[in-house]
Design a protein with these regions (language model features):
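Soluble, non-transmembrane domains of integral membrane proteins
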Residues: 212-233
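Extracytoplasmic/luminal low-complexity segments enriched in Pro/Gly and acidic/polar residues
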Residues: 206-212
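A detector for small-residue-rich transmembrane helices and their helix-helix packing motifs
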Residues: 1-206, 224-228
Length: 233
């Protein structure tokens, strides 16, 4: 699925550039009825080659992580991030066309990161750290620093991703081993903390008799008063 999504973005961009078209009017135009269609179409539209290239790799990596580790909810996470974030961008963002898949990307990154945090599993926390390692700099994208960057899309995508991570925290991830909990059984003996027992040797003969060739060896209990001077190893 991530590969097909990335391929579709490149095909649409190639059509736009090849035929000299301008798809930017299919982005989200906040608080305009004509801009509502952008909630559906805006993730497919990119301003230039750099914009598209910057979004392609995160779609492949984060999309693969989502599908591999959370296949049960992957589709719902993508669609919810796509549409809910898009609606809030239409409601609250600046009155310009907002285009690009970065809102969905921020949603996936936030979902993957906070899924590990909320579940408190080491294996899933490794995914969170992986996301931070690759895309930790994305955090700055939710602030209005660059005027031509839709930080509103980034912000709402991240917010939706966090909410979804909390909502689906009870869904078991795939390909990640569940924590193993060992339960005590009633008939199972507890490990003994007593020190190792030592051996004592009893010679069943009178001092005046000739010693037997092989003495009898018994295990001494704690109640017996005699102990040998050496541990049996």
């Amino acid at each position: 699925m991530p590969l097909l999504a990335a391929l579709l973005l490149w095909v649409l961009f190639g059509i736009e550039q090849g035929y000299g078209l301008d798809f930017s009017s299919w982005g989200i135009l906040p608080r305009h009825l004509s801009g509502l269609k952008g909630i559906v179409t805006s993730p497919f539209i990119h301003g230039d080659l750099e914009h598209l290239a910057n979004n392609t790799f995160p779609i492949l990596v984060l999309g693969w992580c989502l599908v591999y580790f959370y296949p049960k909810v992957a589709g719902r996470v993508v669609l919810a991030t796509w549409f809910i974030a898009g609606v809030w961008v239409w409601i609250s963002a600046r009155p310009n066309y907002h285009i690009g898949a970065s809102g969905v990307i921020y949603g996936l990154a936030a979902f993957l990161f906070f899924s590990g945090v909320f579940r408190k599993q080491r294996s899933l926390m490794a995914i969170s750290l992986f996301v931070v390692f690759l895309y930790g700099g994305m955090a700055w994208g939710v602030f209005p620093i660059l005027p031509r960057v839709s930080w509103e899309s980034h912000l709402w995508g991240a917010i939706v991703g966090v909410i979804l991570a909390w909502m689906y925290r009870g869904v078991a991830p795939a390909h990640v081993p569940e924590p193993i909990v060992l339960e005590d059984e009633e008939d199972e003996e507890a490990p003994s903390s007593a020190p190792p027992r030592r051996l004592h040797v009893i010679y069943h003969y009178d001092p005046g008799d000739e010693a037997p060739e092989h003495p009898r060896t018994d295990l001494a209990s704690d109640a017996e008063p005699w102990w040998s001077d050496h541990d049996h190893t």
